[in-house]
């Protein structure tokens, strides 16, 4: 699963369009930078929080439907 060009592609290679979302992570610089990148591409219309951002740039997101999505922010 990965995130690219304002879409999320899941493990079955299904593409999901991503809408607007504000994500704020008041933590270390790395997480803040990742959050800024997510905000810049308008990531995820119904995401309510980022559960984790690890050193490899992998994101765990919690959606309003209580589904956790793990993806990677790619260029």
Residue ranges: model-predicted function:
Residues 2-6, 53-75:
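Intrinsically disordered, low-complexity, charged/polar segments
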């Amino acid at each position: 699963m990965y995130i690219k060009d304002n879409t999320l592609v899941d493990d079955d290679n299904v593409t999901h369009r991503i809408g607007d979302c504000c994500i704020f992570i008041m933590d270390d610089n790395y997480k803040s930078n990742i959050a800024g990148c997510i905000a810049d591409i308008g990531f995820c219309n119904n995401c309510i929080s980022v559960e984790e951002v690890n050193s490899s740039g992998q994101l765990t997101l919690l959606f309003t439907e209580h589904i956790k999505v793990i993806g990677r922010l790619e260029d």
